[in-house]
Amino acid sequence: MRLEVFCEDRLGLTRELLDLLVLRGIDLRGIEIDPIGRIYLNFAELEFESFSSLMAEIRRIAGVTDVRTVPWMPSEREHLALSALLEALPEPVLSVDMKSKVDMANPASCQLFGQKLDRLRNHTAAQLINGFNFLRWLESEPQDSHNEHVVINGQNFLMEITPVYLQDENDQHVLTGAVVMLRSTIRMGRQLQNVAAQDVSAFSQIVAVSPKMKHVVEQAQKLAMLSAPLLITGDTGTGKDLFAYACHQASPRAGKPYLALNCASIPEDAVESELFGHAPEGKKGFFEQANGGSVLLDEIGEMSPRMQAKLLRFLNDGTFRRVGEDHEVHVDVRVICATQKNLVELVQKGMFREDLYYRLNVLTLNLPPLRDCPQDIMPLTELFVARFADEQGVPRPKLAADLNTVLTRYAWPGNVRQLKNAIYRALTQLDGYELRPQDILLPDYDAATVAVGEDAMEGSLDEITSRFERSVLTQLYRNYPSTRKLAKRLGVSHTAIANKLREYGLSQKKNEE
């Protein structure tokens, strides 16, 4: 059990916390103190009544502002994140001490040298890599990285060795060792060829006019080129599957298969055979069918604990067993996961494996809700109108001048999917050649409630405040549909309201005066 105690910087507060644990006979496993006013405690599980009583007593300590449970200590979180990152790297990476002895290595290193981690730690870098004097380089106290061509097991590598400096108790930077990364020259050449040949139009179907969506697309284009697992998060209807496919198409795997599985729509007993195959029936699973390509696991938060364990094993070494068979199969597949759920929350509740979360959370893409991207609403509307009209072979209707105001005022709880369905539904029943606000039927939705949801608490104070401010303006603008009326209602100047509406994309195009 781990607690995060929010507190003031007061002399003796930590001692009072420890005395409280001693008084209750609680065995403390660890304590970590954060300089920004947080103390982390790690101790054995308690009965509910004892735990509730302890929480109440901690809150009564002078200087304590709050206390809550957390799934991990800061050092544990950093260790798990580092381990997941190292495991995801396709290049061999070694960490060596001042004697050039290996103290950490990732799976790619173990595979290259044909040694398990515990045996690699018995070697020095010089015993593993010929042609470079590691000790002499470390003794020279280098300040910059050094690149060197090396040959290992007949393979050519570009070795990059980077010095690691840490601060001592006197705030002096002391050299403690180095990190060695080995880049295969063959792999680097293939990557350059793939970059030149990648599908530059992969993201062309994604509308990105708003700054937030532009940033997400730029981030996705970079992540698409990597082979590590990708986790895409976002509310329902934000386009997670569209981004997953675009990442595949923009990657070196574009010419290989892309398969998608919704973990929430398939019974638990069928998921294993769908993913890994069924030997008695001679059926290949998704991973085997997509060898060399990508697999999207949608709604990963719905996966059962048993399948989570099997997925974790597959992510670690790329091997699996078909149902009803002992033979191991190895494939090269990039796994992309998508979810609208808060995986950290599921980890805290014991519904999602902590180690799997860290394995998936190496590369993440968070898609913003449509209400946070008002500049994208009309371009999306124009796209859906044109697409539907062309599919039906009918003339494209004109968009009414006041349509922008109505659509950008709405909060869109269903995001892009809801907008698309609303436009399609309106066009199927449209009389005439103009799409007007009254043609689009939208369920009542209180936009003001958006700002107090859990997702609205993410980001900086300015971002949270902006979301709340936009929600208030969106809600009130319905009942006070002019800048002067709205300004009077809120007790601010007409100019201030006009600027705010323009900032959030809520202003009408025609003159409101």
Curated annotation (Swiss-Prot):
Matches recorded under SMART domains: AAA, PAS
Residue stretches making up the PAS domain: 78-114
InterPro entries attached to this UniProt entry: AAA+_ATPase, ACT-like_dom_sf, ACT_dom, Homeodomain-like_sf, HTH_TyrR, P-loop_NTPase, PAS, PAS-like_dom_sf
UniProt domain Sigma-54 factor interaction: residue ranges: 206-428
Domain ACT: 2-72
MF annotations from Gene Ontology: ATP binding; ATP hydrolysis activity; cis-regulatory region sequence-specific DNA binding; DNA binding; DNA-binding transcription activator activity
Listed GO CC annotations: cytosol; protein-DNA complex
One of the GO BP terms on file: positive regulation of DNA-templated transcription
Sequence positions that bind ATP: 234-241, 290-299
Chief site of localization: cytoplasm
Effect of residue 173 to L/V: Reduces the activation function to 73% of the wild-type value. Does not affect repression of aroF
Activity control: Binding of ATP strongly enhances the affinity of TyrR for tyrosine.
Induction, as annotated: Interacts with its own promoter-operator region. Autogenously regulated by a mechanism that gives similar rates of expression of tyrR irrespective of concentration of the aromatic amino acids.
Domain text: Contains an N-terminal domain (1-190), a central domain (206-433) and a C-terminal region (444-513). The N-terminal domain is required for transcription activation functions, dimerization and ATP-independent aromatic amino acid binding. The central domain is involved in ATP binding and hydrolysis, and is responsible for ATP-dependent tyrosine binding and hexamerization associated with tyrosine-mediated repression functions. The C-terminal region contains a classical helix-turn-helix motif responsible for binding to DNA targets known as TyrR boxes.
Protein function: Dual transcriptional regulator of the TyrR regulon, which includes a number of genes coding for proteins involved in the biosynthesis or transport of the three aromatic amino acids, phenylalanine, tyrosine and tryptophan. These three aromatic amino acids act as effectors which bind to the TyrR protein to form an active regulatory protein. Modulates the expression of at least eight unlinked transcription units, including aroF, aroG, aroLM, aroP, mtr, tyrA, tyrB and tyrP.
PANTHER family, alphabetized: HTH-TYPE TRANSCRIPTIONAL REGULATORY PROTEIN TYRR (PTHR32071:SF3), TRANSCRIPTIONAL REGULATORY PROTEIN (PTHR32071)
Name recorded for this polypeptide: HTH-type transcriptional regulatory protein TyrR
Organism this protein belongs to: Escherichia coli (strain K12)
Originating gene: tyrR
